[in-house]
Amino acid sequence: MSDVWQQQRQRMVDEQLRPRGIHDQRILAAMANVPRHLFVPEALQAQAYSDQALPLTLGQTISQPYIVALMAQELLLNPHEQLLEIGAGSGYAAAVFAELVRKVVTIERHQALAQQTQVRLRNLGYVNIEVVWGDGSLGYPTAAPYHAISIPAATPQLAQTLLSQLHDGGRLVAPIGDAQDQQLIRLQRQGQNWQKTTISNVRFVPLIGAGGWEHAPETTAEGE
């Protein structure tokens, strides 16, 4: 059966990612290697390599493969770097990032989900991922600074506390906008200045916490 899953991953890379502009060979290799079917509910495993977000528990989702690959590519990642992910979900994106950087810190606000994800990642052999339980909307200063920050959840603005946790030269990718429609952007720190790049129009689940929304607004989303 492992060969079947591997074939599905390779088909995902060849049919969903390459044609849509994912060209970084390290990212394509990571996407072909990480077993997405082990990060979704068992009842949805047959859909694991389809081009769609899938539901998890507690109202969370796992991002569609293209979005994970796109965010990884836009973060301009290097092997020696440390990355912060806000919103661990099932740990799929963290696993992809872990194949691209030295260390991943991923923070999840749902304690039960954080615990499940920690066990899953440990069982899959990911030793360079730290799963933290807490409000990630303000980042995680304990392990800062970071070379890259990934926020796979929509927020109306970015907290200065979060931005200050980036290294000089560091990059942050996040969907910014209202609860229904956002723009995926990259901010790159240049001293006290920021270079902004708009990537695409997107629709993600909301970022809940002190640095995002206090309560979840109604939305339909493609993000994790």
Curated annotation (Swiss-Prot):
GO terms for cellular component: cytoplasm. Transmembrane segments: none annotated. Keywords: Cytoplasm, Methyltransferase, S-adenosyl-L-methionine, Transferase. It comes from the Bacteria. The active site is at S63. Its main location: cytoplasm. One of its GO terms (biological process) is protein modification process. It holds the Pfam family PCMT. One of its GO terms (molecular function) is protein-L-isoaspartate (D-aspartate) O-methyltransferase activity. It is found in: Cytoplasm. It catalyses: [protein]-L-isoaspartate + S-adenosyl-L-methionine = [protein]-L-isoaspartate alpha-methyl ester + S-adenosyl-L-homocysteine. PROSITE patterns: PCMT. Its EC number is 2.1.1.77. Catalyzes the methyl esterification of L-isoaspartyl residues in peptides and proteins that result from spontaneous decomposition of normal L-aspartyl and L-asparaginyl residues. It plays a role in the repair and/or degradation of damaged proteins. Belongs to the methyltransferase superfamily. L-isoaspartyl/D-aspartyl protein methyltransferase family. PANTHER family: PROTEIN-L-ISOASPARTATE O-METHYLTRANSFERASE (PTHR11579), PROTEIN-L-ISOASPARTATE(D-ASPARTATE) O-METHYLTRANSFERASE (PTHR11579:SF0). HAMAP family: PIMT. NCBIfam families: pimt, PRK00312.1. This is Protein-L-isoaspartate O-methyltransferase. It comes from Herpetosiphon aurantiacus (strain ATCC 23779 / DSM 785 / 114-95). The gene is pcm.
